[in-house]
Amino acid sequence: VAVFSDELRDGLCGPVGDKHKGAFLAGIPGEEMSVKFGIAGAIEHPQVHCDSVNYTKKPWAKQPVQMISYVSCHDGLCLVDRLKASMPSITPEQLIRLDKLAQTVVFTSQGIPFIYAGEEIMRDKQGIDNSYKSPDAVNAIDWRRKTTNGDVFIYYKRLIDLRKSHPAFRMGDAAPVSYTHLRAHETL
């Protein structure tokens, strides 16, 4: 059984309840410990001080595979819409770079990576939050984006390949993550 890490999602993107407020991806300081918590897989780690993590004050996973690493899902804004809402003046180039950065964190974190359908081609839902009652024009995946955003698609594919090829990104046991193999730079 695994749990979605809202700590990582909101540490990167901003609080789900305030779509206009950014966080780490927007260059706003204060959520670095939540990002570290997610990278470590929601387990106890000597460089994670849970008193500074959003939503939790102690590790809630015993093993990193009990945490799902993600930045968006069907509830709430998709990643592209979230970045646009929290950074209204974002350029298309910045959007692509931050999208790639967000997924780099997801795929190089301990835990189980999760991507929302269409994120690999920069899907948007026209800024509609929680679109379960919206029409297909909002919810359908526009596969033409695979052509226009082919470089992003290839980037995601390479992240998946990297994760599969290197066991450091998928350690199932907490001990090597906490005490041997995972160290964060002190400025993060």
Task: Please tell me what each predicted stretch does.
Residues V1-A117, I121-M122, Y132, P167:
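Conserved alpha/beta catalytic core and glycan-binding cleft of carbohydrate-active enzymes
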Residues L83-S89, A137-T147, P176:
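Charged, low-complexity surface segments at secondary-structure and domain boundaries
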Residues G118, G172-D173:
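Short, glycine/acidic-rich hinge or "gate" loops at secondary-structure transitions
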Residues I121-D124, A175-Y179:
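A glycine-rich phosphate-binding loop feature that marks nucleotide/adenosyl-phosphate handling sites
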Residues K125-N149, F153:
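Extended hydrophobic/aromatic segments used for targeting, binding, or gating
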Residues T148-M171:
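Catalytic cores of secreted or luminal carbohydrate-active enzymes
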Residues H181-L188:
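Single conserved hydrophobic/aromatic residue that forms the stacking wall/gate
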